[in-house]
Structure formats: C-alpha cells, structure tokens
Amino acid sequence: MSSAHFNRGPAYGLSAEVKNKLAQKYDHQREQELREWIEGVTGRRIGNNFMDGLKDGIILCEFINKLQPGSVKKVNESTQNWHQLENIGNFIKAITKYGVKPHDIFEANDLFENTNHTQVQSTLLALASMAKTKGNKVNVGVKYAEKQERRFEPEKLREGRNIIGLQMGTNKFASQQGMTAYGTRRHLYDPKLGTDQPLDQATISLQMGTNKGASQAGMTAPGTKRQIFEPGLGMEHCDTLNVSLQMGSNKGASQRGMTVYGLPRQVYDPKYCLNPEYPELSEPTHNHHPHNYYNSA
C-alpha cells in the first residue's frame, strides 16, 4: 500500500465557492496561539504548515494524553493512510469524552483531505475552552460558564408565598361572559335600565343598539322615482305616467302636441289669423295686386 495521501481533484462551481468562503473564515492569529499552546504542552515542533503537521494525528493524540492521561491507548507512528486516519479518529473520541460538544468537533476528512481547516481550528478552540474549565492554564479560547447551583431551605422557599404579585386579589367576579366574537353586532340593551327591547332583529342599523322598531319598509332602489304624496294631507294624486324634471307634481302638464325633434314648427293660431280668400279663375289676373289676395281686415 502506498504511503501517499488520498488525492482529491480541484473544486469547481459551487463547491469552489463554498471552499473559498470557509477559507476566508480561517483566523491566522488564532492559529499562532494554538501552535504555541500545543507545542508548549507536547514539547514537539509542529512545522511550518500547521495543518500538515497535525494531519498524521500523532501530535493530536499526544496532546490529548497530556490533557487527560490515558485518553488514547495506542498511537500509530506508521505513515500509512489508515493508521493516520485511525489516530485522528481516536483523537475525536478522546475529546468527546473530555467534554467537547459533538457539534464543535470536526470530521476526519476535514483535516486529512484539507476540506475544512476552519472547522478543525474551531474544534481546537473549543478544546481550549473546555481545558480552562478543568483548571488548565490556557491563554486561548473563552472559558465556559460554570454551573452555579444553589440549595434553599424549605423555610426559605415558604417565604416566597408571602410575596404579593402584580395581579393578586379579586377581579370582583368579572368574566368574559356575554362577550361576542370580533366583528359581530353589539346590542346596547340592559333590562335593568327599563329601556325598550330592540324589535327589528333583521335590519342592521348604522348605530349599534336599538332602532326603536324602524325598518327599511317602503324604501325604493337607488335611482327610482320618489312620489311625494301623503294621503293624510288631503293632496291630489300626482301624474304617475309622465316623468317630470322636478320630483313631485307637474300640475297636469304633458307632452301632448309635441313634435319629433328636427321637424319644422308652424307658427299659426286661428284666433289671430283668418282664412285666406283666393280670386276666381275667370277674373283677369292683371286687375288684382298681390297684396289683395289676402284679406287683412
């Protein structure tokens, strides 16, 4: 079996874009701090390339054995690929037992195949934070918050019952009885007040409450004629056949004698104009003047 590492082809498209974004999150200052911490604990040099020095898993196994003795029983010094992957797997199992959360731990291929160095760095920082909670003097990472457990005596717990809350007391027996659903009608009626009950339950008025028996009886559709006539007043009936320009009575006027629009109109009245007298045909026409054809008297 060849000792060469597994080779992965270059990434293209979306894979290359994701890889570049992960590489941009890598913190080189944190890398230097982790290098100094690991080299100081193990006493071994990692090399110029930080991730290549950790890829065989030997330094990682020795490092966790320093933090927690006996975490990794056997460290493989072989250069074979499966031996190196076994070392990385043993390191992952050891830091899980040490207390590092599973979602903070990298996968073996993230380090061995150089797919996600940012996650490897995050795992080492989480390991440093866990080491601080166990008493190790580490200048890397943030210390996890410790549990602050408190025990209270039963007498102390009973004292809490004497505290008056913001809504202590009685609500004077108020309840939501009689409440209607949002958007429904509300009848402003109380039998204690002695007011009349709402009669018309089918007509929705503009003002909530009772309409005192008023309804829409006799209302006509919008745009129809409105007859202004009241029998109680003793008025005569109006002409319902002709539509007048003004609502009400047109005093018997009609359109009788009206001609069709566009026809000539004869200005003639028999009271003022007499019947014309025409000359007889036997009389000579030269003895009569044109103005004698009509009797103007």
Curated annotation (Swiss-Prot):
Calponin-like repeat residue numbers: 164-189, 204-229, 243-268
GO BP of this protein: actomyosin structure organization; negative regulation of vascular associated smooth muscle cell proliferation
GO CC annotations, alphabetized: cytoskeleton
Keyword annotations from UniProtKB, A to Z: Actin-binding, Calmodulin-binding, Phosphoprotein, Repeat
Record has Repeat as a keyword: yes
UniProt key word Iron: no
Chain positions with Phosphothreonine modification: T170, T180, T184, T259
Modified residues (Phosphoserine): S175
Domain Calponin-homology (CH) residue range list: 28-131
Free-text tissue specificity from the UniProt record: Smooth muscle, and tissues containing significant amounts of smooth muscle.
Gene3D superfamilies given in the database record: Calponin-like domain
GO molecular-function terms, A-Z: actin binding; calmodulin binding
Function statement: Thin filament-associated protein that is implicated in the regulation and modulation of smooth muscle contraction. It is capable of binding to actin, calmodulin and tropomyosin. The interaction of calponin with actin inhibits the actomyosin Mg-ATPase activity.
PANTHER family: CALPONIN, TRANSGELIN-3
Self-association and partners: Part of cGMP kinase signaling complex at least composed of ACTA2/alpha-actin, CNN1/calponin H1, PLN/phospholamban, PRKG1 and ITPR1.
Protein family: Belongs to the calponin family.
Name recorded for this polypeptide: Calponin-1
Organism: Mus musculus
Gene from which this protein is expressed: Cnn1
